[in-house]
Design a protein with these regions (language model features):
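A short beta-strand-loop structural module common to alpha/beta enzyme folds
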Residues: 27-40
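Donor-binding and catalytic core of enzymes assembling or modifying cell-surface/extracellular glycoconjugates
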Residues: 10, 183-203
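Secretory-pathway luminal glycosyltransferase catalytic domains
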Residues: 40-186
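A short, glycine/small-residue-rich beta-strand->loop->alpha-helix junction that serves as a flexible
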Residues: 6-15, 160-166
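Short, flexible loop/turn elements at secondary-structure junctions
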Residues: 8-9, 37, 155-157, 193-195
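Short beta-strand segments
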Residues: 33-35, 150-152, 188-193
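Extreme N-terminal starter segment of soluble prokaryotic enzymes
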Residues: 1-3
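Histidine-anchored nucleotide/phosphate-binding helix
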Residues: 13-25, 171-180
Length: 203
C-alpha cells in the first residue's frame, strides 16, 4: 500500500492525491491518504460547510483515510527544486510498495493518462455543482456570444508571506495577450481570489 501525506493548500493536496494515487494504481498497489495533514498554518478561505481540505470536501476521498502508518514503511520525500530538469521525479515513479510519500507532486504528467479517473475523484458535491451550473447558465444567457476567461488572483496569506505576489503588470499583460489572441471575439474575464470577496478596484 502507498500512503500519501497531504499538505498545505487545497490545490497542493489535489495534485499530491491525483499524482500519488495514479502512481500507486499504475504499479498495482493499494492507495490511502494519511489522516494527519502537514503545514496547515497558512490557510486561505474556509467554507462554512465544506472546510478547506480534500477529506472535508470530497466524501469518497475521506473514506480512503488511514490514521497511522504501519510499521516497516519506507518514506519517499519529493525533491523537486527550481534547478530540477523536469517537474516529474523518476524516483517517485519507482517507489516500492509499503511507502509513505511526502510532497506536492505538482505535474499533470503523473496523471494525464488517467484524466477521466481524476475528474471522477474530484467530482464536486451536488449542491456546489448545481450552484455553479446556475451561475454559468446565467452568464451564458447574458453574454451569448462571448468567451469566458477565468482569472485566479493569488493574493492570500501564503503568497504574501512567502513573497510570491505577482505585480499588476503581469495580470495586465496576460489579459492583453488573451485579447490580442481573440481580436474578433468578446472576452468576459471571471475574476476570483484565494479568499471569498468582491472585486473592489481595477488597476
Amino acid at each position: 500500500m502507498i500512503i500519501c501525506k497531504l499538505s498545505d493548500q487545497l490545490g497542493n493536496q489535489m495534485f499530491a492525491y491525483a499524482s500519488v494515487k495514479s502512481i500507486a494504481l499504475d504499479k498495482g498497489y493499494d492507495f490511502k491518504i494519511l489522516g494527519e495533514y502537514n503545514n496547515q498554518f497558512l490557510k486561505n478561505d474556509t467554507d462554512k460547510k465544506y472546510g478547506n481540505t480534500l477529506t472535508s470536501i470530497f466524501a469518497d476521498i475521506a473514506k480512503e483515510t488511514v490514521q497511522e502508518v504501519p510499521d516497516g514503511y519506507s518514506v519517499y520525500k519529493e525533491n523537486i527544486t527550481i534547478d530540477s530538469r523536469s517537474d516529474v521525479e523518476e524516483g517517485a515513479l519507482k517507489v516500492n510498495d509499503n511507502t509513505l510519500m511526502l510532497g506536492h507532486y505538482i505535474s499533470p504528467k503523473y496523471f494525464t493518462h488517467r484524466l477521466k479517473d481524476v475528474q471522477d475523484w474530484f467530482k464536486m458535491p451536488s449542491d456546489i455543482d448545481e450552484k455553479t451550473n446556475i451561475t454559468i447558465k446565467m452568464l451564458k444567457d447574458k453574454y451569448p456570444d462571448a468567451k469566458f476567461c477565468s482569472v485566479h488572483f493569488r493574493n492570500a496569506l501564503d503568497y504574501r508571506v512567502k513573497g510570491y505576489m505577482l505585480s499588476s503588470d503581469y495580470w495586465q499583460n496576460a489579459a492583453k495577450k488573451v485579447l490580442d489572441n481573440n481580436i474578433s471575439q468578446k472576452i468576459i474575464f471571471l475574476v476570483f481570489y484565494d479568499r471569498y470577496s468582491k472585486l473592489v478596484s481595477v488597476v
